[in-house]
Amino acid sequence: MYSPIPQSGSPFPPTVKLPGLHIWRVEKLKPVPVAPENYGIFFSGDSYLVLHNGPEELSHLHLWIGQQSSRDEQGGCAILAVHLNTLLGERPVQHRESQGNESDLFMSYFPHGLKYQEGGVESAFHKTSPGTAPAAIKKLYQVKGKKNIRATERVLSWDSFNTGDCFILDLGQNIFAWCGAKSNILERNKARDLALAIRDSERQGKAHVEIVTDGEEPADMIQVLGPKPSLKEGNPEEDLTADRTNAQAAALYKVSDATGQMNLTKLADSSPFALELLIPDDCFVLDNGLCGKIYIWKGRKANEKERQAALQVAEDFITRMRYAPNTQVEILPQGRESAIFKQFFKDWK
């Protein structure tokens, strides 16, 4: 079970309570602050804590798990999340975010979309800095989606391209936003915005950005990628966001540690649920895993062990139910319930 770091050894600064966005990369059980100019860049081999403090003490704490992050890093991220949540008086709603399956709320913090880069902590130490010669940079990113646009690093080759998406070819001093003939307008706008963001945040504004239409590739692109072959066709269906609001695909469980171990008791196997089932003395699992999400509701009078074990309970539940590892998790303190959570219950105003 994840346990908090002693208060006397808090690795978080007092500024953690200030409004706005705070991001840390987890490194050897320590939170390493991410510079604001690098917000939205995530290394696939790492885990991150993302805290957003909004108005009226409305906070959301996200654990972002990279596809290639180690179990140790993920465990360290969970331990730090428990500590940070306690430090903030257990006010934040907690979310577990998996690379490529982030929540809409998480995506809203990054108007230019996300950029995934290969590697982990070691790669982060050697990434481009203001003193690095930009001419040495050669990276390719695929920009894909309709509602939530993400940029993912790809192999530097025409084989990575298709006609249905947009791609960013970052050559340091020149940044090309290439738009496939069948790409959608949202992808094109995001590709342009992300290319400009790379220029401004990573090149201090000293790079040339060019929007490239499929079939009108400049010589610099051909020089790096070679002669352009016939490209794969894009699949517009892949860009559709699945509807995750089917309230019937749900079940409600009560969490108890009365025996010294965390046990689950099913209270109802279909929604809408009776609101009276949620009592302040306990924690509950709302299983909407078939639609990609698990909720943990923490009663304000539940014991500390149950409250702090919420994330572990969710992860064990996902494993037990054989749901996808990237299933989203949302942990809600009593009084911080979202509208989506409330829709599973009868007459919750």
Swiss-Prot record:
This is Macrophage-capping protein. It holds the Pfam family Gelsolin. Calcium-sensitive protein which reversibly blocks the barbed ends of actin filaments but does not sever preformed actin filaments. May play an important role in macrophage function. May play a role in regulating cytoplasmic and/or nuclear structures through potential interactions with actin. May bind DNA. It is found in: Nucleus; Cytoplasm; Melanosome; Cell projection, Lamellipodium. It comes from the Eukaryota. A motif (Nuclear localization signal) lies at residues 138-147. Interacts with NUP62. Interacts with NUTF2 and RAN; involved in CAPG nuclear import. CDD domains: gelsolin_S1_like, gelsolin_S2_like, gelsolin_S3_like. The keyword Repeat applies. The modification Phosphoserine is found at S338. One of its GO terms (molecular function) is phosphatidylinositol-4,5-bisphosphate binding. Disulfide bonds: none annotated. PANTHER family: MACROPHAGE-CAPPING PROTEIN, VILLIN. The modification N-acetylmethionine is found at M1. It comes from Bos taurus.
